[in-house]
């Protein structure tokens, strides 16, 4: 009775702020799974805290409460003899909060879909494409892989509001990851760059540009014989300076987060994941606490 590695979707704030996306935490992203397996994931995250705002916008003391539900599908693939995966995630969120705008208190409520996210990943070293029967004898050592995620510029968005659920821009996130197993322990490291398109209809009709956000993430995972696994995570990110109508903002981000994940098998097809994270050191950008849960159902030939 095991929970397949790397198949539970990442759950992050479905807001337009770039740093919330860059702070996403996902242990076991680079691991092996039998070819042809399908995964359906439904999840919920509650997050509360500050939000990313441009230095040129007089918004201070911001605090948001965000309830996010996520539906995702993933499938493991054979990519030229190496294991891979494709997944798609669609978030829906409800947010409410308050802040001070030009010294006056303001409030905001919104709900709607966030932009869908598509990702393809491939393991280059240490994770060959295997059938369910072959996978029974597989033992992980060192895995090296990469992924490419794309976010679509759709979802709820109102240019007359500073805070929205959709982002009204594309993003592309290439990532490189390494995973080393020794006994029940696995150490994982990954580095990524989140590259943003321009929002040509930002608040007040302005054009908003944002520099890439670079991140470094580490996980220490312990796997129990029962199929339960637990992970501690630390992530650091920097970059993301914004430009509004050609004017550079003084909002370089340089922050870190810590988190924990617990994955529990229910039976051969069903599993549950519990998750929590918090800001550790925040210079500029999104500072929030989050807790969540996800349910996964898997099916495929040989299961």
Give the ranges of each region predicted by the language model.
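Outer-membrane beta-barrel biogenesis signature
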Residues: 21-41, 126-140, 300-303
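Transmembrane beta-barrel strands of outer-membrane/channel proteins
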Residues: 40-46, 86-94, 144-152, 189-195, ...
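Outer-membrane pore/translocation modules
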Residues: 94-209, 250-251
């Amino acid at each position: 009775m095991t929970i397949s590695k790397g198949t539970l979707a990442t759950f992050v704030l479905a807001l337009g702020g770039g740093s919330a996306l860059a702070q996403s935490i996902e242990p076991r992203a680079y691991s092996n799974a039998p070819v042809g397996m399908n995964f359906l994931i439904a999840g919920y995250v509650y997050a509360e805290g500050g939000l990313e705002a441009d230095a040129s916008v007089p918004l201070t003391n911001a605090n948001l409460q965000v309830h996010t539900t996520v539906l995702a599908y993933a499938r493991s693939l054979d990519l030229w003899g190496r294991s891979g995966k494709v997944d798609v995630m669609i978030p829906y969120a409800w947010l409410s909060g308050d802040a001070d705008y030009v010294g006056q208190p303001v409030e905001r409520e919104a709900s709607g879909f966030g932009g869908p996210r598509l990702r393809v990943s491939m393991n280059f070293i240490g994770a060959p494409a295997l059938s369910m029967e072959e996978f029974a004898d597989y033992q992980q050592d060192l895995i090296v892989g990469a992924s490419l995620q794309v976010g679509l510029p759709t979802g709820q968005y109102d240019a007359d509001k500073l805070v929205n659920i959709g982002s009204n821009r594309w993003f592309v996130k290439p990532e490189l990851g390494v995973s080393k197993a020794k006994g029940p322990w696995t150490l994982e490291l990954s580095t990524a760059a989140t590259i943003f398109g321009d929002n040509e209809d930002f608040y007040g009709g302005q054009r908003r540009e944002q520099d890439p956000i670079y991140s470094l993430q580490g996980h220490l995972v312990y796997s129990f014989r029962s199929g339960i696994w637990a992970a501690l995570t630390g992530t650091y990110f920097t970059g993301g300076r914004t430009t509004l109508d050609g004017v550079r903002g003084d909002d370089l981000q340089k922050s870190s987060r810590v988190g924990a994940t617990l994955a529990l098998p229910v039976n051969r097809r069903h599993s549950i994941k519990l998750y929590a994270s918090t800001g550790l050191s925040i210079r500029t950008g999104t500072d929030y606490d989050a807790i969540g849960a996800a349910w996964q159902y898997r099916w495929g030939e040989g299961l």
